Regions:
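Walker A (P-loop) phosphate-binding loop of P-loop NTPases
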Residues: 14
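Conserved phosphate-donor/acceptor-positioning beta-strand/loop module used by diverse small-molecule
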Residues: 97-117, 149
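Conserved lysine of the Walker
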Residues: 17
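Hydrophobic anchor at the beta1->P-loop junction of P-loop NTPases
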Residues: 9
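Conserved substrate/cofactor phosphate-moiety recognition/catalytic segment
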Residues: 21-64
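Glycine-rich phosphate-binding loop used to anchor ATP phosphates in small-molecule kinases
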Residues: 54-98
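Pre-Walker A (Motif I) flank of P-loop NTPase domains
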Residues: 2-6, 72-73
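Small-molecule kinase domains that catalyze NTP-dependent phosphoryl transfer to phosphate-bearing small molecules
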Residues: 119-162
Length: 169
């Protein structure tokens, strides 16, 4: 029997991980979706090694549950995984529970990121200060594991199609 697959979507804030992840989920029968932000939703927000490790553990717990569910065929995880040790922990944890993995890092130009950022009126943390943080992180994300996907000039649907084509090759 073929193992279930988890598709990890990584990238800076505003790259389109959640939007693309939801589109992938809707395109694959029996696909679950995990937004890593749900797994460390603290108020006020605290992003440090302790909370990142907790979120990774929460993601792995959810992956194990979906892996044991007969109705689930695969999972998409969208999260900002900016530390190699977090990527490693998720990769190793997924392997331990018998999941195949596919990693994609969504990247874009600074201009595309800014345009998307300013167009998202619903997200309360789309501030100019956070945009600067996201722009500064672009280069670091290009060095992390995963198939790089330059989403500049692409719609979310085109990014989804690109990823699904890559998975079918």
């Amino acid at each position: 029997m073929k193992n279930k697959r988890v598709i990890f979507l990584n990238g800076p804030m505003g790259a389109g991980k959640t939007t693309v992840g939801r589109l992938i989920q809707r395109s694959l029968a029996g696909c679950a979706f995990i937004d890593g932000d749900w797994c460390m939703d603290l108020e006020p927000f605290v992003g440090n090694s302790e909370t990142r490790a907790m979120a990774a553990d929460n993601i792995l717990h959810m992956l194990a549950g979906y892996n044991n569910c007969s109705h689930c065929r695969g999972v998409v995880v969208a999260w900002l995984m900016d530390r190699p040790e977090i990527c490693r922990a998720l990769e190793e944890g997924a392997a331990k529970i018998g999941l195949e993995t596919a990693w994609f890092t969504l990247l874009c130009t600074e201009e595309a990121l800014g345009a998307r950022w300013r167009g998202d009126k619903l997200c309360p943390w789309r501030t100019e200060e956070n945009l600067k943080v996201s722009v500064r992180s672009l280069e670091a994300f290009s060095r992390l594991p995963g198939v790089p996907v330059d989403t500049s000039g692409m719609t979310a649907e085109q990014v989804r199609d690109h990823i699904l084509k890559h998975l079918s090759d």
